Swiss-Prot record:
InterPro entries attached to this UniProt entry: Arg_deiminase
Enzyme class label: hydrolase
Active site per database record: C397
Protein name: Arginine deiminase
GO molecular function: arginine deiminase activity
Length: 407
């Protein structure tokens, strides 16, 4: 029976979610390569895995189905067409040369699908291929150089794809370190039995083209419900990407308006959900910088001719209130004094995952903000994040909802 895939809000009952447990890709994160791979630090992989297990089990205990990306990818590789497509896209003739690439693909094709999935996310070094594969390319590389670089940011399943009402955007990622992630998700959504033949829309990102500056990441996309989508214009999500997604949503009659808000272009504000999440019907968790009156905000609507009508909004909060039909948005700001609030925002105090209205999962270390949630009537299910938090992502970043009720 085909599973239902629909995300109608940020706060309706969460029913199914995709996570990725830390694995080989994080073991290959080092002080010398972590910046290139978009991490600020190296993690204790074993401890991060334990913390992730607690996160996953917290969701399961709430009756939420948890699917793991590595399992989905392994099962997708059982389909020969999917396996061949992934090998062709991840082991490119143009990057490795046709002879060497052909030999590496042939060797990988003989692996168990579990091991192949492990390398598709964890990377492959020259030292791991058999000595029988000889080539000029091999001769000019060290054994610890990567044939396929690891994808440690797969941990943040929110970004690579995001479900919006009756469809999914498979996102063209902004940074080279993350762009190969998209092909793993494209294969899963195209061939895995859970999704193949499903009656859902692919809005954006599932074509073999260079998306250039039209990049989009799911951490910037909030499905606030009632036909509205809120998108942050960040260092990762561009106006071009937002326009393409908005046009697709309107074409398929899946949204009535898209609210675009300009974010500061710095690391601590990498995505909208690092500074703002929807946690109850009228309630948002925010780091105050994003709701300043001088922040640029627009509402996009269909112009009736296949294009977009753009309306400048006076404030982000006013735009949200109009979209949701509420009198006033209630804000819960990051807790503590100025120093504590900055520290807790950095440690993802605002990046909580809402399970149902007024119930969220967040890192236990953010004591000041969690106390404010509690006083405001929001239930926090705490999870450890001393290691996971080093990746600069919280519970929302680490989850891709596949089925969630509307409001």
């Amino acid at each position: 029976m085909m599973e239902k895939h629909y995300v109608g809000s940020e706060i309706g009952q969460l029913r199914s979610v995709m996570l990725h447990r830390p694995n080989l890709s994080l073991k290959r994160l080092t002080p010398s390569n972590c910046q290139e791979l978009l991490f600020d630090d190296v993690l204790s992989v074993e401890r991060a895995g334990e913390e992730h297990d607690i996160f996953a089990n917290t969701l399961r205990q709430q009756g939420i189905e948890v699917l793991l990306l590595t399992d989905l990818l392994t099962q997708t590789l059982d389909i020969t067409e999917a396996k061949n497509w992934l090998l062709e896209t991840q082991i490119s003739d143009y990057r490795l040369g046709p002879t060497f690439a052909t030999d590496v693909r042939a060797w990988l094709a003989e692996m168990s699908h579990r091991d192949l999935a492990r390398h598709l996310s964890g990377g492959l070094t020259y030292g791991e291929i058999p000595a029988s594969i000889k080539n000029m390319v091999v001769d000019t590389h060290d054994i610890n150089d990567f044939i396929m670089k690891p994808l440690p940011n797969h941990l943040f399943t929110r970004d690579t794809s995001c479900w919006i009402y009756n469809g999914v955007s498979i996102n063209p990622m902004a940074k080279p370190a993350r762009q190969r992630e998209t092909n793993n998700l494209r294969a899963i959504y195209r061939w895995h039995p859970q999704f193949a033949g499903g009656e859902f829309i692919k809005y954006f990102g599932d074509e073999n083209i260079n998306y250039d500056h039209a990049t989009l990441e799911g951490g910037d996309v909030l499905v606030i419900g009632r036909g509205a989508v809120l998108i942050g214009m960040s260092e990762r999500t561009t106006p071009q990407g937002i326009e393409f997604l908005a046009q697709a949503l309107f074409k398929h009659r899946q949204a009535e308006r898209v609210i675009a808000v300009e974010l500061p272009k710095h690391r601590s504000c990498m995505h909208l959900d690092t500074v703002m999440t929807h946690i109850d019907i009228d309630t948002f968790s925010v780091y105050p910088e994003v709701v300043r009156p001088d922040v640029n905000c627009w509402t996009l609507t269909p112009d009736g001719h296949g294009g977009l009508k753009r309306t400048q909004e006076s404030t982000l909060l006013h735009a949200i209130e109009k979209a949701l039909g509420i009198d006033q948005v209630r804000l819960i700001t990051t807790g503590g004094d100025a120093f504590e609030a900055e520290r807790e925002q950095w440690n993802d105090a605002n990046n909580v995952l809402t399970l149902r209205p007024g119930v969220v999962v967040g890192y236990e270390r953010n004591i000041w903000t969690n106390e404010k949630y509690d006083k405001a009537g929001i239930t926090v299910l705490p999870i450890p994040g001393d290691e996971l938090g080093r990746g600069r992502g919280g519970a929302r970043c680490m989850s891709c909802p596949l089925h969630r009720d509307g409001i």
